[in-house]
Amino acid sequence: MAPPNKLPTRKLAKNGPEISAVGFGMMGLSIAYGVAGSDEERFRVLDRAWELGCTNWDTSDFYGDCEDLIGKWFKLHPERRDDIFLASKFAIKVAVKKDGSYDFSVDSSPESCRAACELALQRMNVDSIDLYYIHRIDKVTPIEKTMEELSKLKIEGKIKYIGISECSSSALRRAYAVHPVAAVQVEYNPWDIDIENESGTDLLATARELGVTVFAYSPLGRGIMTGKYKSKDDFEPADTRRFYPRYNDENFPKNLKLVERFQEMAARKGCTSGQLALAWILAQGDDIIPIPGTKKIKYLEENVAAVNVTLTKEEEQDIRKMVNEAGIAGDRFERLGPYSDSAPL
C-alpha cells in the first residue's frame, strides 16, 4: 500500500528514480541532539514520515542504533519497504576513550566498505540499499579503490546507487571516472553556501557538470533557522551543538541576525522561518534535495509542508542578498574535514 500522501519528487542523477523532494535526515533520531526517544516514540515519527509521503530517508552506520531502528520498523511494516528510498553511509568510526570522550576516525578502505555494507543490510533487514555513501574519505585509501568495491557491491545487487559525502570536486571527478556517482551530500543552508564557491571547491558546479544530485544536509543550519534557539542554553545537555563554534556565547548573537531577517520575511509570507529556508534551498535547482532531520512529529510536518512555499523571483533575490551579507561568525565544525580530497592512486 502506497503512502496516503504524495510529495513532489525530484529525479536522482541522470537515470535514477523519482524521490520525494524533501527527505528525512535521521541522525537526530539516535544521536547528537539530546536523548533519543524510545523505539515506540521513534516508530511514530517514521510512521508519520511515511504517511506524509516523505519516503526519502537518510541514515548511516555512524548514527547510533538508527540502522537497527529502521530494521525493526521494516519488520513491523514489510509491505512499506518498496515505498522507501533508503540511503545509508559508511566509513566514520567512533571509539570511546578512557575519559568518556569520543575519538573519531575514518576508514573508507574496500574492506571497511564491504563489511559495513553487509552489516547494514542485516541491521536494516533489507536485501539492498538504494543509495550507499562514502560518509567521509580517509587520508590513505585512493578513492578509486573504494569505488571499485562499491561497483562490485552494486553488481551483486547489495546497493543500487553510489554517493559520496563531503568530497572535493577533484575527488568526485576521480570517483566518477571509475563508476557514475549518483549523489553528493554536503551541508548547504543559508548559513553555509561554500558548495557554490571556491571555498567548497566549486562542488555544486562540478556536480551539475556530471549530472550528480546534491543532498543538502543540515538545511536548517542544525535547527537554528527555525528561530527556536536563542542561545546555547536552549540546547539539551547532551546536545553536541553546545560545542560548535557558531553557537558559542560570542558568535551566536551575531548569527541570529540572519535568522531574524528570515523570520520577518516568513511572517509576511505566512510560513515559518524554517520553511522559508527550505523553500530557498529547493529553489536553488531541481538537482538539490534537502534532508532536514527531527525527532518530533510537529517539526517533521512543518518541514514537509515547505514544498508548498513558493518564492517569487524578487523574494529569492532578496534572500540571496541576505545570505551574501550575513557574515556568519565561527566555523561549522566539520571535525572530519569538509570537501575532502583523496589520497593519490
Where in the sequence are the language-model features?
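A short, structured active-site edge motif that brings together acidic residues
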Residues: 82-95, 190
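Active-site groove signature of glycoside hydrolases
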Residues: 121-140
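N-terminal binding-site loop/beta-alpha segment at the start of enzyme catalytic domains
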Residues: 1-85, 345
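Short, well-ordered amphipathic alpha-helical segments that serve as non-catalytic structural scaffolds
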Residues: 45, 110-121, 262
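Structural motif
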Residues: 48, 52, 123-124, 157, ...
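Structural preference for beta-strand elements that scaffold enzyme active sites
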Residues: 19-23, 55-56, 62, 83-87, ...
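Active-site mouth loops of central-metabolism enzymes
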Residues: 28-40, 99-114
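Beta/alpha (TIM)-barrel catalytic core signal, keyed to glycine-rich beta->alpha loops juxtaposed to Asp/Glu
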Residues: 2, 6, 137-322, 326, ...
